[in-house]
């Protein structure tokens, strides 16, 4: 089914055909990588974690969602904290919510819902994470998942995300990049930008210090030349 979906969408993945279970990476690693490859390496290579107010609020929100149990109606079934994985993409994780909507022919159409504490981000990291969940569900259930939803705590409403060809391609490319980063087993050097100020890893990463050292080395080299 996954092959048919890719063929219809015109995507040409360069990913290995199948990953071993032991080689799967967390879906959250894709989001970390898109935000900052160094952050991804700190979490998934060096096994570091730093929590601030934002990550704590996000963790509490997810814990509330995951303990909600199950919900069932005549045309809707809701599963919480659903384990998912894709051997093609080499990823695994847990979906906050998967809604199954009854279709006219009697089949159930899954719709993944991811909860976020803040507001929509300027980058695609949340959309990529959600689409990765959908591609896992497609591979596991042998169906097509055309869209999902992001629920942001500050807005208190859902944002529908359509899983088009471009977004799916980004998921595949990001998954491949994450596997490459982890296989290299090295942490990229820090690069400071405005996003660093809200990152929980700021005290550990120290991007400003590293940037100042680079400038100092450059000026020293210019003087000595």
Give the predicted meaning of each segment.
Residues 6-7, 168-225:
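Non-catalytic C-terminal interaction segments of nucleic acid-processing enzymes
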Residues 87, 138-140, 189:
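Generic marker of residues within folded, mature protein domains
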Residues 34-39, 46, 88, 132, ...:
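Solvent-exposed, flexible loop/coil residues
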Residues 60-64, 70-74, 160-168, 200-213:
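Short, charged low-complexity intrinsically disordered segments located at boundaries
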